[in-house]
Amino acid sequence: MNYIEGIEKAFKEYIGENSIDKLKETITKKPMILIAGDQLTGKSTQAKRLSEKYNGKNLSVGTLFREEAKRRGVSVAEQARLLKKERGIDVQIDYSTCKMIGGMGLDADLAVIEGRQPAFMGGFMESLGKEGLVRIYLGCSVREQALRFLKRETTKEDYLFVKEKLPEEDFENLEDVAKEIDKLDIPNTKSVMKAFIDNQNRDEDDRERYHKLYGFDYRDVEGYDVIINTTNKEVEDVAKEIIESIEKHDESWIERRP
């Protein structure tokens, strides 16, 4: 079963037999940029910049997740735990993502949607007739992810010290980079690194869930039109690289600049 069939099967089971017909009704000609990737790769930052560049709406799957938690009367953390054992919440969020990609009701000419699964939901919407999608994957090294987390959660002094001392290598996993940082013997770093691993493990949880439920791996670059490695790059340089890649992939985006 390919992922298109997997998504259709799940939607019919959890949303309803007429769910696909309802999705077709949401399809407009409004183009969409779909950004995916792990946490700390720059998705949110670049989505905001792209929406400003093309005068579009900046939308996030994370917002749908928070809205669903509020509707159910649970915390975001509790809902994340429920996803591990309760089917249906995630399918509803993915269905809402597809409606978002369709563009019906969007109060802008286009949108930039970021999350982990938008590109593959976009692939499903393309199978229903949606056009004008650009699917982008942002990635970076485990070392870079750890440094970005430290920059956010510790002092500037500690961050710069770790950045200078941490070996310039692409660590194989989260635990290896955490152990290397622990060796630097900085106060509170151990607890920060534990939080980093817990935070990043959500990516693996989601990856496993999407594969089991739909049959796709959101890290599979075959599902994307543009792939950007953000390691050791400034925000402005990444934005420039993304824009150039989008407009090379589809020249019509040049005309969409305000």
Question: Which residues does each predicted region cover?
Answer:
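Walker A/P-loop
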Residues: 44
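ATP-dependent small-molecule kinase phosphotransfer cores
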Residues: 61-129, 142-147, 151-193, 197, ...
